Amino acid sequence: MEVIKHEGPGRLGVVRLGDYSFRTPALVGIDFTLSPFNSFFHPKEPGEYDFNLAPSIPLGFYTPDEVIQKAIGRLWSVNYDGFNAFYLPALRRTEYLEEFFKIIDRHNFDAVYLGNSKILIKEYRYFVRILRELRERFPNVMIIADLEPFFYPLAVYLGIDAFDTRSLKLYDFEGKGFTQFSPFLWSNEPNSLDFAREVILLVRKALEEGKLRYLVENFFPTQYNAGILRIADLEHPDYLEKYTPIQKETVYFISDASIRRPEVKRWHERVLERFTPPKNVELLLLFPCSAKKPYSFSRSHTLYRRAVKEALGSGTSKVHELILTSPFGVVPREWEWLAKYDIVVTGHWSEEEIKPAAELLAKTLEKYPEDIPIVAHLDEAYVEIAKLASELSGREIIFTDVKNGTTSHESLRSLTETLREFQIEGTKEDRTYRYFENIRKVFDFYFGVGAGEAILPENGQVKGSKMLRIFVEGQQTGTFTDGVISVTPYGMQRIYDALKSYWVKIDFELRGDVFAVGVEEADPRIRPDDIVGIVRDEKVVGVGKAVLSGEEMVRAKKGVAVKVRKRV
């Protein structure tokens, strides 16, 4: 199986079988054929199927130790020649997984059938853990499971690629037709295969458009769906995050599950690890977010900045701004183009929103020198967040007198009067420095602290108006447009020399895309869709867009790892 696109561990892929190929997620009996279970005690030879299951022993989920041990011993004696699919019985005793994995690894199977799936789905932690271990260990293996269609979005999101539809005939026999609200509401007309096909097409569409997580959050028909997603979010956030691309479009946070999305975890980590305040800051301001994005285009932030300009004049080039929001917590002004999200606004914040935002703000405040004054122009729950952050960080925060909202005449007057107490003057050099910093911080977000300085050092130049072209010593390093960046091979070389980040190492002459089989090493920080430098003998020979995560590139044996955009 070759991966075309990721959203979380979920993959849009293609499976090639000689002259025939099909896309995943897929359905047994519709997209490809799969042999029946092949018993070790009555083994059958490979037949005329796309995937032939090797002889196996049907171990139940609660099978005792002594039976499992005896079965594994027998499975090592099987002749696996001609079989391209392995039956993996999901067991509560997960310590035996490694033995099954050794068999899969040794015989290079193309597919794994996950047995006991319908019991496993009720064991939240085991379900997520087994899928994670399979997916991380065997990136090119197609995972097949026997589940009802209302589990398809969640199962695909966590790493399953195909579904066995043969057991769905039982619902037809019972006269139950699936609906959007099954298993609580059923139709009187049997429709199992049609409904399965509709759902799988919907899942593919969601993957294509980067909206699979959104679909998952709208498919919560059972407690099992909700429980499994919660376990995945809370106990395996790194598993979800490393396969999740940086969002290019607006992310919609529509439920309590939304605030646990991997994009939120990543944002918090990057604020802590990749954001550094500008060096010339003499005053820090805290503002609330706005419904309109980017914030600077909103009426409220236009009024805030007008008040700041009125109070400080040239000193605005020495002021830094942090925006408080849910669920991202803290958005530095330079990163407002990157915070593409929308959320239900009611004025009511849950503890699950307030505490993480306050903790993130507290840690962010610690990045600023202790003598830098902090002024907060906030209302409602934002005040609670700032006060808690002040307690956690030990930093004093001055609050303006807000009445009738932060944009009322009285509130804006209070903001102006509060800021006039600070004597701050900026120079032309400060304005130029902050202009450069607005660009640098975005490159830091994508590649790490120091990337912006590598792309745009003090002797760098910025040309253009809408699309900014960045040059160092006459050579272009990249472009910048409203938070969207590109990097040239020369710019990527400077980042590689400075940070050793976002690289993929090869040992051949680069002529086209980089396939996974040709990847020697890759930076584990790479996520799908990231800009990466292709390195040979410590020289960047090309720049491209990652298809796989860095870890996945090294493990995978098939498919494109990097789509090359520019070569040296």
Swiss-Prot record:
Q: Which GO terms describe its biological process?
A: tRNA wobble guanine modification
Q: What happens when the gene is disrupted?
A: Archaeosine is no more detected among the modified nucleosides in tRNA fractions.
Q: Which reaction does it catalyse?
A: 7-cyano-7-carbaguanosine(15) in tRNA + L-lysine = 7-N-[(5S)-5-amino-5-carboxypentyl]formamidino-7-deazaguanosine(15) in tRNA
Domain of life per record? Archaea
Q: Which InterPro entries does this one have?
A: Archaeosine_synthase_1, ArchSynthase1/Queuine_TRR, DUF5591, PUA, PUA-like_sf, PUA_sf, TGT-like_sf, TGT_C2_sf
Query: What enzyme category does the UniProt record give?
Result: lyase
Q: In which pathway does it act?
A: tRNA modification; archaeosine-tRNA biosynthesis
Instruction: Return the PROSITE patterns for the record.
Output: PUA
Q: Name one GO cellular component term.
A: cytoplasm
Record domain PUA: where:
496-565
List the NCBIfam families.
tRNA_mod_ArcS, unchar_dom_2
What job does this protein perform?
A: Functions in the biosynthesis of archaeosine, a modified nucleoside present in the dihydrouridine loop (D-loop) of archaeal tRNAs. Catalyzes the addition of L-lysine to the cyano group of 7-cyano-7-deazaguanine (preQ0)-modified tRNAs at position 15, to generate q0kN15-tRNA, a q0N lysine adduct identified as 7-N-[(5S)-5-amino-5-carboxypentyl]formamidino-7-deazaguanosine.
Q: Which family does it belong to?
A: Belongs to the archaeosine synthase type 1 family.
Complexes and interactors: Forms a robust complex with the archaeosine synthase beta subunit RaSEA, likely an alpha(2)beta(2) heterotetrameric structure. Formation of this complex highly increases lysine transfer activity.
| Protein name in the entry | Archaeosine synthase subunit alpha
Q: Which gene encodes it?
A: arcS
